[in-house]
Amino acid sequence: MKRFISLAFIIICWSCAREEGPPPNILFIEVDDLTAKYLGCFGAEFAKTPCVDELATSGVVFNNAVVQGAMCTPSRNSLVTSLYPHNLNLYENLDLKSLPKGIWTFPKALQKEGYKTIWVGKNHLIPNSLGIRAKNPVDLRNKALQIEMGFDEVFQSLGRSFLIEIASKQLNDEGCWEMGKDAYADFLFENNLLDTFLQEGYTFPSSLDPNSEYMDGYFTSIAIEKLRKYEEKEPFFMWVNFSEPHAPFTAPSEYTRMFSEKNMPEVIDPDCENFNVPKELKPNPVPETVKTVFNYRKRYMGSIAYMDTQVGRLTDFINTSEFRDNTVVVFFSDHGIMTGDHGVLGKNTLYKEVLNPSLIISYPKEYEAQRIVTAVELLDLGKTVLDIAGASGETINNVPNGNSLVPLLNDQGLFGGNGIGFSEIRGVRSAFNGDYKYIDHPKTPILFNLKIDPDETLNVLEKEPKVAASLKIALDQWLLMSASNPDKTGNNTN
C-alpha cells in the first residue's frame, strides 16, 4: 500500500526518474454530464462505448476519482483554477458572473512551460472580461479565454442548450441574424442550417450530419483539422470540450436505436433507502412514470454512443499521426447526472452517479495500463499536467490545491494525497475514501459503507460512528486548510 510523503520529495523522485527529452503533447477530452456507470470500461455490459473502452484498455483508469463541483460551471472553473467551489463561492451555474481578474490557471502555467494552448468546443469557463475590448460577444469570450484563462487559440460555443435560446431570441427580437453571438451558430447560419437547427430545437433526433454539422461532430472536425495543420516546434495542450451527453439528448437516431428497455440498467429504488434523505440530495425528483425514466435513459444512452464515436474520431487521428508516441490523452467528464436512481434526475447532488468523472489517462509509452483504486480529485489534474510537462518543483508548489497523479501513473515515487476526495454542493460537503462516503449535512449526517452498499441507500452512521468521525475530521481539516492558505485566493501570479 502506498504511503504518503511530502510533495517536495515526490517531485524530486519523479524529476530524477523521468527520461530526458521533449515534453509530451497533452490532449484533454472533456465531455458533459457523463455518468461513469454507462461506460463499458466502468462495468456497463449494455454500453455501446468501444472507443472510450479502448482508451481505457491502453490507459490508467481511476475508479474512485471525484469531481469537486456537482454542476458544469462549478466543476470546470474549479478544475482550471485548482480552487475548490468554496474558494470561489461557486456552487451552481449562475452563482458567479466571472472569476477574479488575473486568477491563476494551469493553462497559463503551461504557456510559461513553452506549451501552445488550444481550446476547442463548449465553454463553461467564466473569465473576467473587464477592460477587454472586442467587436462582438464571440470576440469578447475568445479574448477573455486567451488573456484570463491562458489559451493561445480559441474556438468555442456556449453549448446546444444555450445556443437554442440565443438563436431563438435573436431572430425573434431582431428579425435578422447578427453575426458574433456564438461561433457555432454563425457556422449554422453561414451554411443555411440554422432554420433546421431551430425547428428541431429540443426535439429528438437531430437531422444534422453527425460528423460535420452536429455540434460535437463539428468540434471534433475542428480539433482534427487544427492538429493536422499543427507545425509548431513547441508541444501542444489542446482541451476539446464536447456538449454530449448533456440534455436535450438529440443524438442522431441510429445511436438511440441501439437501445431498448431490455438493455437498460436497473433503477436504484428509493424505497430501499433506510433513512429520510435530505432534500439537498434530491433536487430534481423524477416526474411521472417509469416510462419517463426509460425514455430519458434511452435518449441519454444514444447521446453517449454518439459521443463515443466522436471520441474515437479524435483518438484514431492521434493514433495514426506523428503525435501517436508523444501525446498524453486525458478523458473525463465535468460530472455525471442522475437518470432516475434514488428517484432523481439531473445533477447538483452528492450521489456517486454525479461525482465520478470517468477519469482515464492514456500514455502507453510511459504508463502501463492499470486501474487505480486510490481516491483522487479531478482538481488534481492541474498539478498532474504541470508535472507531466516537466515543470519545476517551485511551479508545481505554486498550484493552489491538489496533488500530482504522476506517482500513481508511473508507479514511481509516492502519491502526495491522503486518499480522500472532497466534493461540495451549496451547504453540504462529502468526503470519500473509496470504501466509505461521509456526507456532512447539518441536520442529517450520512455515512455510506460502499463495500456492502455500493448503491448508497443505507445510512450506517450510527453503526460505524468511528469511521464517520474520522472522515468528518478529515473534511474539517481540508476545509480549514484550503480556506485559510493565502494562496487559495487564486490571485497569485503565474
Question: Which residue ranges define each predicted feature?
Answer:
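A short N-terminal helical cap/helix-turn-helix that marks the beginning
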Residues: 476-479
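Formylglycine-dependent sulfatase
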Residues: 2, 16-439, 455-473
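Sec-dependent N-terminal signal peptides
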Residues: 4-13
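Short, charged, surface-exposed hinge/linker loops at domain edges
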Residues: 484-494
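Short hydrophobic beta-strand that contains or immediately precedes a catalytic carboxylate
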Residues: 447-448
